[in-house]
Amino acid sequence: MKYHQKDIVEVNFLFPDGTFKPHPAIIVSNDQLQVDEDGMFYLVLITSNDWLNPQYSYPLSDEMVVGFSFSKPSLVKCQIITGNIERDVVRRLGTIKARYFNEIVDKIVDSIF
């Protein structure tokens, strides 16, 4: 398995207008899911767009991440989750620290359920 939970990866996200745009994302599903589901994992979108549905956003800063720095202020959009497989990943960017990852998961649960 090449990618793991907490990894920040770049993928092409499909938007409602049918276009694709590369974005960083955090792998939120556990590694066992990839094994059980033939390599599938779930990602949550990272963006610098802070105007759309801010109530579902979790702000990120460089100190929350290992191995990567954001070029702009960035947020996790906790309501935007996709299922992907390894071939969808353009590249691995870094890893989110465990403490912040757990806060993001809590925000996802609050945002969706």
Q: How would you name each of these model-derived features?
A:
Residues 19-22, 27-61:
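Compact nucleic-acid interaction/catalytic patches
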